[in-house]
Amino acid sequence: MSGKAQIFKQTGVRWLWLALVVFLADIGIKFIVMENMGYGWANRIEVLPFFNLLYVHNYGAAFSFLSDQAGWQRWLFTGIAFVVTGLLTYWMSKLPAAEKWNNVAYAMIIGGAIGNVFDRMVHGFVVDYLDFYWGTYHWPAFNLADTAICLGAAMIILDGFRKKEEEK
């Protein structure tokens, strides 16, 4: 077996399939939203008393961070996503495939990051469509990629606590 095949079989790189699934699901949902929903608040679909589907453009990062800037943030966030994707992929190549928790976390972040980079490169903005609210307060709209990134980051944080508990 070649060295590259062994790396793929025995290391966390094997979990990159999950990043691909997250990426494909993210761009697939965004395509459906763009093709089937009208843009903006007036075209929202009220699903639950605290949740709407809503097609909006986000020129910033997760939860509209820096969306009011002049456009430089598109390139900043794209660069950050490439660096993070490279680092996480490298770390996955050093982790055993059996270490599922961190590999899944890294793959989710990679898939989400690539999904949002795809939007920035193709559209010049990120498509957001999930709108949660309480009363009149609305959390900034977000998408599957943002969700995957946040869940992956939360898993990494939780892993830090798990390891400290195991050491005691």
Swiss-Prot record:
Annotated membrane topology: Multi-pass membrane protein
Tagged with keyword tRNA-binding: no
Keyword set, alphabetical order: Aspartyl protease, Cell inner membrane, Cell membrane, Hydrolase, Membrane, Protease, Transmembrane, Transmembrane helix
Bilayer-spanning residue ranges: 15-35, 47-67, 75-95, 107-127, 141-161
A GO MF term: aspartic-type endopeptidase activity
Organism, scientific name: Vibrio vulnificus (strain YJ016)
Pathway assignment: Protein modification; lipoprotein biosynthesis (signal peptide cleavage)
GO biological process: proteolysis
EC numbers on record: 3.4.23.36
Catalytic activity: Release of signal peptides from bacterial membrane prolipoproteins. Hydrolyzes -Xaa-Yaa-Zaa-|-(S,diacylglyceryl)Cys-, in which Xaa is hydrophobic (preferably Leu), and Yaa (Ala or Ser) and Zaa (Gly or Ala) have small, neutral side chains
Name by which UniProt lists this protein: Lipoprotein signal peptidase
InterPro entries to which the protein is assigned, alphabetical: Peptidase_A8 (IPR001872)
Domain of life where this protein originates: Bacteria
GO cellular component, one term: plasma membrane
Known role: This protein specifically catalyzes the removal of signal peptides from prolipoproteins.
Pfam families: Peptidase_A8 (PF01252)
Catalytic residue positions: D128, D146
Localisation per UniProt entry: Cell inner membrane
Family membership: Belongs to the peptidase A8 family.
